[in-house]
């Protein structure tokens, strides 16, 4: 029994994925995959939801995605799970945003956005996710597609990364 527990703990500690979490209050929804929170001593942080890419606000379903996130998160206390860096429980990404999973009452909000057909699983950064999480996100996207939920109700929804690329050139 002790050996099994020890092995599980060691497996976790030696895992290539090291995550920490911190509690924060959601104060603003930027779009379907970005929020502002107050953390610690009222420090404002911008959070980019890990593993998803929601439609941009000017895209089809961009407003719906943002509205849904606002409905379920605005004003709520959440846990943010992110990779720790130095003395902080988070790492900043390229645009100086915390990249993390948002958890509300034990539920994975990033995953919920995919299940509701309001975001893609952002596979470009899948290496930043544990394997079981990747599988859950892939499965959720497949099921939403099959059921024509949200953005999947359109014939050929344009992924936000392609939309951004097309609109940068203009």
Please describe what each predicted stretch is:
Residues 2, 6-7, 16-170:
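Small beta-barrel nucleic-acid-binding modules, primarily SNase/OB-fold domains
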């Amino acid at each position: 029994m002790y050996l099994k527990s020890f092995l599980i703990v060691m497996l976790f500690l030696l895992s290539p994925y090291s995550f920490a979490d911190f509690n924060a209050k959601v104060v603003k929804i930027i779009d379907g995959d970005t929020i502002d929170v107050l953390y610690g001593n009222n420090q404002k942080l911008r959070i980019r939801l890990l593993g998803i890419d929601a439609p941009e606000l000017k895209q089809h379903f961009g407003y719906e995605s943002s509205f849904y996130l606002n409905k379920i998160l605005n004003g709520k206390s959440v846990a943010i799970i992110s990779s720790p860096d130095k003395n902080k429980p988070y790492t900043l990404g390229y645009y100086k945003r915390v990249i993390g999973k948002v958890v509300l009452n034990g539920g994975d909000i990033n995953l919920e956005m995919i299940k509701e057909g309001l975001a893609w699983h952002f596979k470009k950064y899948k290496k930043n996710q544990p394997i079981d999480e990747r599988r859950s996100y892939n499965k959720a996207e497949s099921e939403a597609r099959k059921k024509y939920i949200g953005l999947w109700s359109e014939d050929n929804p344009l992924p936000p990364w392609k939309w951004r690329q097309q609109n940068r050139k203009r």
